[in-house]
């Protein structure tokens, strides 16, 4: 595998869309495929940075970083971290997370939050190694 290069996606191109269609089902089998218009909305939004990890020309990982201001400060949240099954264990997830943490800090966030299912043992181990701490909180979701 070539050296991993991580960069924000700045153009909603066909290769990024194809990568989303290939990678997102590896994260969530219940998610609907993203459309080119939806990808364009993500890329154009000031509140979202979509990072792509490439090995050569192939996109082998994605991470979405949401950054937003609320009355108590700038918040950052990592979502939809996925590394292709063929590239796991090769530093792709770490490279994506480090890029997101750097961008969040550059934009003024003091903390970055994420959630991860307990069954994702390797991912949880990575987050802890990177310095994430498990919070004593409840996470709630309201389905609309």
Pin down the residues of each PLM region.
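Residue-level recognition of the GNAT/N-acetyltransferase active site
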Residues: 84, 117
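Acetyl-CoA-dependent GNAT
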Residues: 3-74, 79, 97-98, 103, ...
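Conserved active-site alpha-helix within GNAT-family acetyltransferase domains
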Residues: 94, 118-136, 141-142
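Short, contiguous strand/loop micro-motifs
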Residues: 26, 87, 110-111
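Conserved acetyl-CoA-binding loop-helix of GNAT-fold acetyltransferases
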Residues: 83, 89-102, 125, 129
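Conserved GNAT acetyl-CoA-binding A-motif
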Residues: 104-116
């Amino acid at each position: 595998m070539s050296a991993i290069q991580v960069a924000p996606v700045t153009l909603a191109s066909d290769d990024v869309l194809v990568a989303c269609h290939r990678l997102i089902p590896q994260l969530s089998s219940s998610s609907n495929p993203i459309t080119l218009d939806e990808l364009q909305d993500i890329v154009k939004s000031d509140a979202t940075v979509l990072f792509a990890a490439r090995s050569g020309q192939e996109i082998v990982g994605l991470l979405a970083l949401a950054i937003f201001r609320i009355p108590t400060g700038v918040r950052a949240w990592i979502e939809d971290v996925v590394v292709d099954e063929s590239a796991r264990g090769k530093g792709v997830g770490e490279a994506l997370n480090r890029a997101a943490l750097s961008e969040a800090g550059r934009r003024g966030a003091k903390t970055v939050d994420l959630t991860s299912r307990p069954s994702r043992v390797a991912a949880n181990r990575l987050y802890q190694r990177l310095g994430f701490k498990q919070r004593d909180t409840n996470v709630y979701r309201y389905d609309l």
